[in-house]
Amino acid sequence: MIDMRSIQKSFGANIVLNGVDFEVLPGEVHALMGENGAGKSTLIKVLTGIYERDGGTIVVNGREVHYRHPKEAERDGIVVIHQELNVIPTLTVAENIFLGREPKIGRTGVIRYKEMEQQAASYLRRLGMDLDPRELAGRLSVGKQQMIEIARAISTNAKCLIMDEPTAALTEREIQALFSVIPTLKQQGVAVVYISHRMEEIFTICDRISVLRDGQFIGTKRVKETNFDEIVQMMVGRQIGERFPKRRVTIGEERLRVERLTKKGLFENVSFSVRAGEVLGVAGLMGSGRTEIMEAIFGARPFDEGDIYIDGRPVRIRSPRQAVEHGIAMITEDRKQKGLILEMSVHENLTLPKLEQLATAGFIQSSKERDVVLTYIHLLNIKASSPDLPVKALSGGNQQKVVFGKWLAMNPRILILDEPTRGVDVGAKKEIYEVINELAAQGAAIIMISSELPEVLGMSDRVMVVHEGKVQAILENDGLDQETIMRAATGGNR
């Protein structure tokens, strides 16, 4: 259906795509993989007419094309479903599906709502979705809004859906709903290009995997004929060893204890502890209250009652400043909104929490600042052409490393990580895991929220499972499996 050959694209002297080949067959699910900055997004933008290619050919349905706008690609059945969904919350499900293509009475401009709602219901049924076409889209979950986008694509007679990190903001149940829709699309001859860093998903639903590295096409493999290690080596150009690096840490005394922490409507009677050198994994479905509990401990969210102890002593924390004073740092799941100031440089972001220590008589000592910046750029292997580069210019993985560096610079004794590797490629994940292990080895107590159960199992000493704002279970990670965690996360027996 789609055949891209020898695609070239440069921005100035920077070669972003260098002779890339990419082929998509009708009715297949084809993963497009590569580290952050490998060229995946640029390739899709070239395909759909957002960027003009410098060289190479694109053939769609046997005809060479040269799209100038995504609308032209859509007319040929190529539709992109972006990570940031394009759903208008104040319109109904049906209005979103037919936006700009509403059936009307002659030339009057009057919309035939009943017909539109019936057609919308028909497209939703094709996806196995029982959604009311008259429901306001803003009242639906992210997963159901994503189904609206898929229904919209099918209504335009889409032949190829390009999904960019489609499960990043979905609950486990919504992910399963998406996975049940994809075979339906395949049966209807619709191809799916699936862009994701989540290996488990790739090997579950994809037929073939194509890998880019540093703007070059490395190869295509059939999922049945490859494995995790081979794909990782294709992506990073080297063997990265064990997926989750082993730790040799002696777990020390209790560092943090929380008792009966409660915020009405969000979480209730939460009690747990974490020791020096320990990694406590926190699992639970999206919306279970995991993040809200940790925000309360960090002083970013008020709570009604409960006590927090550090090294056995009660502490009062009502703001992030007070948390930082007690040696607590928190790396948030939304790095762009809460973790970074995107317009500021790498070095400015790295030194934000440490400005007081870098100042003498109220003036920042530039030599001290430079030493701190270079130390953490080197330690975390942050790929930036200059420390003065705006942090928004970095890849997702390198942005996440800057967030880590920002808080590591204050030498935290307790580090709370909320989805630390979301949207990060496999090579950068391994580097982040090694940093977590190093911090634990230095005696920090680590709390790690993650929706990726292999990550929870691979990195944690114990796992706390949260369900509907309550601690459902605290499990030793000795022979623990994903099924046991999911059973607790859905309210089942421990």
UniProtKB/Swiss-Prot annotation:
<keyword id="KW-0547">Nucleotide-binding</keyword>
<keyword id="KW-0762">Sugar transport</keyword>
<comment type="function">
    <text>Part of the ABC transporter complex RbsABC involved in ribose import. Responsible for energy coupling to the transport system.</text>
</comment>
<feature type="domain" description="ABC transporter 1">
    <location>
        <begin position="2"/>
        <end position="239"/>
    </location>
</feature>
<dbReference type="InterPro" id="IPR003439">
    <property type="entry name" value="ABC_transporter-like_ATP-bd"/>
</dbReference>
<comment type="similarity">
    <text>Belongs to the ABC transporter superfamily. Ribose importer (TC 3.A.1.2.1) family.</text>
</comment>
<dbReference type="InterPro" id="IPR050107">
    <property type="entry name" value="ABC_carbohydrate_import_ATPase"/>
</dbReference>
<keyword id="KW-1003">Cell membrane</keyword>
<dbReference type="GO" id="GO:0016887">
    <property type="term" value="F:ATP hydrolysis activity"/>
</dbReference>
<dbReference type="GO" id="GO:0005524">
    <property type="term" value="F:ATP binding"/>
</dbReference>
<dbReference type="InterPro" id="IPR027417">
    <property type="entry name" value="P-loop_NTPase"/>
</dbReference>
<dbReference type="InterPro" id="IPR003593">
    <property type="entry name" value="AAA+_ATPase"/>
</dbReference>
<protein>
    <recommendedName>
        <fullName>Ribose import ATP-binding protein RbsA</fullName>
        <ecNumber>7.5.2.7</ecNumber>
    </recommendedName>
</protein>
<keyword id="KW-0472">Membrane</keyword>
<feature type="binding site">
    <location>
        <begin position="34"/>
        <end position="41"/>
    </location>
    <ligand>
        <name>ATP</name>
    </ligand>
</feature>
<keyword id="KW-0813">Transport</keyword>
<comment type="subunit">
    <text>The complex is composed of an ATP-binding protein (RbsA), two transmembrane proteins (RbsC) and a solute-binding protein (RbsB).</text>
</comment>
<keyword id="KW-1278">Translocase</keyword>
<dbReference type="InterPro" id="IPR017871">
    <property type="entry name" value="ABC_transporter-like_CS"/>
</dbReference>
<dbReference type="GO" id="GO:0015611">
    <property type="term" value="F:ABC-type D-ribose transporter activity"/>
</dbReference>
<dbReference type="GO" id="GO:0005886">
    <property type="term" value="C:plasma membrane"/>
</dbReference>
<keyword id="KW-0677">Repeat</keyword>
<feature type="domain" description="ABC transporter 2">
    <location>
        <begin position="251"/>
        <end position="493"/>
    </location>
</feature>
<dbReference type="Pfam" id="PF00005">
    <property type="entry name" value="ABC_tran"/>
</dbReference>
<keyword id="KW-0067">ATP-binding</keyword>
